[in-house]
Amino acid sequence: MNKLDSLVKDLPDKELATRFLKQFTERHPSKTEKLQKNEGLLSDALTLASFSPLFATTIIQNPDYLWWLERKRTESRVRNKDELLESLARFALTNSQIEPQILFARFRRRELLRIFLRDIRRLATIAEITEEISNLADAILENSLR
């Protein structure tokens, strides 16, 4: 059994995960090499792709989200609204040429990758996941009303 087979064997949609990796490799060959060297992150990316075609597409379109996820995926606490507002401000600075509604959508999707992964890996309770989604919505709403 090769590495890919062992990583996808317990996923709900092995075919979707495999197709995701093929598409990611075609579009981002150099990033794929880096991803292949980090088995934990590769496993997380395949897991997200297997559970959600939306997240698979998000990662393919925004491969840098993986490296952000690598830094954030070990956090075990709920991020509060103020932390998310700060993170949104940093995201907005690095994406200053994007229309606000697109910026908010991209930020939300990036954060949902992290939150959804915590849920899939059972690193948080349903109450914590719900709280984080609520905090994320509050942060985006507050920022948009400024």
Language model feature labels by segment:
Residues 1-146:
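Non-catalytic regulatory/linker segments of enzymes
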